[in-house]
Each structure stands twice: as structure tokens, then as C-alpha cells.
Amino acid sequence: CRTEHPLEPGIKDKIALFCNVPKSHVLQNLDVEILYDAPLAMEEEHLAQVACECLELECPEPDLDEWRAMCKAWKNPTKKVTVALVGKYIQLHDAYISVVEALKHGGVANSCDVTIKWVDSETVTAQNVSEILSDVSGILVPGGFGDRGIEGKIQAIRYARENNIPFLGLCLGMQLSIVEFARDVIGYEDAHSVELKPDTTHPVIHLMPDQEGIDDIGGTLRLGSYPCVLAKDSKAYELYGEETIHERHRHRYEVNNDYRKVLVEN
């Protein structure tokens, strides 16, 4: 039973009576400080034991030490960082819920409180990017579709590169980091993704070969786990600790290998 306050015995009696269940099966689900306290609270109510008894299953004592340690770390961070999330759907934070939760989980793993600074990419320009991003510890540009806010994202990526601010580009964000590098480091002023500018003279991001000729694009993205070989001198290799990894993808465009040599050399 969801409740803001502990259930009095009389309330439990009434619930048991009208729900036709034993009183021992009326368990309170109190509000908790953080979501991840909920399993611990339910264990205190012996939920697992009650469920196992109903199903006539054995119910060994669970080892929740690691979970308790995680909850403690969540509520007692030893440091703080601010990460700018530069996107175009920021009015609806749930549009980036998986990114937000990943940042929070990464913070917990490092005893760090992560504050997200929401930045509307449509408002970012070469003139104000420093003012907007000078107070952040990291910059993240997530995925998205369409050309709205693209140049603002590229300005944020350039600012991160030029000021050695940790940067993570996801999906379109990663692709735009290639576009920014090609433009501002290599000198290909017209560099772009053919998804956004089909007539670009430097298509550093292009349609994957196996997607060419597909006119009905609904449900045709490359999906699922896909192998990736990491360069041994890369940050990714340092973090993964292995050369070949597998990650899930949902893409139709990728880095154009015709530009791989010049990108690596610069």
C-alpha cells in the first residue's frame, strides 16, 4: 500500500478485511528519500518472503550490502560537477531521460553529485558560447533529428575541444563532433552530414552503404548490438580496457571512411 505515513494497525485490519487477504500480506510502501531506497524498504516489510510463501518457493536471505552501499553513495557524494546537456528538446527533460539517468549513475559510481545544466542549442552562438559554458565541468551533446539547433551544438563542441573540457557526443552529437573537427581543424568549411546537408562538398558523415537505395525509411535503421574496434591510444580503450567491444546502435548514418585518414592524421 503506497503511503506517506506509516500504516496504523487499524488501517491494515481494514485493508485486509476488504481486500480479503491476511493482515500479514498488507505491506506498506512508504515514501523514501530516493527511488533506490524502495527495494530496501520493501525488504524491511518482508515482501520477498510473503511472495515466496504464496508461491511455495524457498526464500533465502538476500545479500543487499552492495545495494545499500550504492544508496549511501547516492546520498553522500564527496564531490560535485556540472555537466551541460546541449540539446533542442530541453523544455521536456524526459526527452533525455536515459542520458540523465546514465549521468546520475556515473556520478554515484564515482561518489559525485552531477548537476545538469540544460542548454538550448538554438540559443548558442559563437558570441555567447563562452558565457553559457564557462562554468561547466563537462559537455554532452545527445542525439536528435533535423537541422534545428545544429550550429549551436557545433559551437558547444568547438568550445569543449578548444578549452579541453571533457566532452561526450551521443549519436548525432558524435557525428557533429566529426563535422566540427573537419571544419575548424582540417579546414573543410563546408563539412557536414549528408543527412542535414545533402549537397555538402565534404560529406564527413554519410549514409551507410547498406542503407543506400532504401526509399521506405520507416523501421530500417541499423539496430542492436554492433562490434567496435577501439584504438589503443584512445580514451575509450582506457575506459573499456579491451580492444573489441559491442554496443547497441540505432543509426542510418556513420563516419565516411573516405575521410578517415585525414581525420586521424590531424
Per-region residue spans from a language model:
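N-terminal beta1-alpha1 cap of cysteine-dependent amidohydrolase-like domains
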Residues: 1-266
